[in-house]
Amino acid sequence: MPKIKTRKAAAKRFRLTGSGKFMRRRAGHNHLLEHKTSNRKRKLAGVALVSKQDLANVRLMLPNTH
């Protein structure tokens, strides 16, 4: 039986926390920032947790994380 491979695109975008949750970046903080408020940019700069609805898909893409 072949080895299970990790989806590298997902591996670059998600990090596993110590409690078993996945962290992700927020969308909308790369460009076109001049019209966004400082408050909005500050909130977009932080990391977010993957929602429980998406968690199963992330785990399928990253099979070697525990």
From Swiss-Prot:
**GO CC terms for this protein?**
cytosolic large ribosomal subunit
Keywords of the record: Ribonucleoprotein, Ribosomal protein
Q: Name one GO molecular function term.
A: structural constituent of ribosome
Q: Which PROSITE patterns match?
A: RIBOSOMAL_L35
Say which domain of life the source belongs to. Bacteria
Q: Which Pfam families does the record associate with it?
A: Ribosomal_L35p
Q: Which GO terms describe its biological process?
A: translation
What SUPFAM superfamilies would the database entry show?
L35p-like
Family listed: Belongs to the bacterial ribosomal protein bL35 family.
**HAMAP family listed in its UniProt record:** Ribosomal_bL35
Record-given protein name: Large ribosomal subunit protein bL35
